[in-house]
Amino acid sequence: MILVQLAAEEAQNPLIPEVPELVIGLLAFAIVFFVLGKKLLPNINKVLEERRAAIEGGIEEAEAMKVEAQSVLEQYKAQLAEARHEAARLRQEAQEQGATLITEMRAEGQRQREEIIAAGHAQLEADRKAAAQALRQDVGTLATDLAGKLVGESLEDHARQSRVIDRFLDGLEEKAEATR
C-alpha cells in the first residue's frame, strides 16, 4: 500500500500545489503584504523623502554658496583692479614729482653755478685791479729809479711821479686796447 500511495503521489505535478497549501500561502502573503504596506513601507517612504529633501537642500545650499563665492570673487577682482589703478596713479604722481624735483634741482644748480661764476669774475676783476695797482706802483718806482739813474738826479717828488707814471701807463693801456 505504501507503494501504491507513493506511485499515486508521483503522478501529481510537483509544480501545481494543492489547494489548501495555495490558500494558506496566499493568506500568509496577503498578511505579510498588508503588514509591510501599512507599517514598513510608510517608514521607508518617510526616510527616502527625508533623504531626497536633504539632498535637494544640500544642492540648494551649494548653489547659494556658489553664488556667494562668485559675488566675493567679483568684489575681489574689482578691489584688485582698483588697487592696480591706484598704484598706477601713485606711480605716475611719483614720476611727475621726480621730474619736477629734477627740474627744480637743475635750475637751482644752474643758479648756483651762475652765482659762482659771477663771484669768480668779480674776484678775478678785483684781483686784476689789485695786481694792476701793485704793478703800477712797482713799475712807477722802477721807472723813477731808472730815470733818476739815467738823468743823474733824484726824482723824489711823489705827486709828479704819480702823474707821469699814470699818464704813461694810460697811454700803454690805450694802445693795447686799440690793437685788440
Swiss-Prot record:
Topology of the protein relative to the lipid bilayer: Single-pass membrane protein
Coiled-coil annotated spans: none
Membrane-spanning residues: 15-35
Listed Gene3D superfamilies: F1F0 ATP synthase subunit B, membrane domain
Domain of life: Bacteria
Record's subcellular location: Cell membrane
Keyword Heme carried by entry: no
Keyword Transport: yes
Keywords on record: ATP synthesis, Cell membrane, CF(0), Hydrogen ion transport, Ion transport, Membrane, Transmembrane, Transmembrane helix, Transport
GO molecular function, one term: proton-transporting ATPase activity, rotational mechanism
Recorded GO CC terms: plasma membrane; proton-transporting ATP synthase complex
Function noted in UniProt: F(1)F(0) ATP synthase produces ATP from ADP in the presence of a proton or sodium gradient. F-type ATPases consist of two structural domains, F(1) containing the extramembraneous catalytic core and F(0) containing the membrane proton channel, linked together by a central stalk and a peripheral stalk. During catalysis, ATP synthesis in the catalytic domain of F(1) is coupled via a rotary mechanism of the central stalk subunits to proton translocation.
Family per similarity comment: Belongs to the ATPase B chain family.
Assembly and interaction partners: F-type ATPases have 2 components, F(1) - the catalytic core - and F(0) - the membrane proton channel. F(1) has five subunits: alpha(3), beta(3), gamma(1), delta(1), epsilon(1). F(0) has three main subunits: a(1), b(2) and c(10-14). The alpha and beta chains form an alternating ring which encloses part of the gamma chain. F(1) is attached to F(0) by a central stalk formed by the gamma and epsilon chains, while a peripheral stalk is formed by the delta and b chains.
NCBIfam families (UniProt xref): ATP_synt_b, PRK05759.1-3
Name of the protein this chain belongs to: ATP synthase subunit b
Name of the gene this protein is made from: atpF
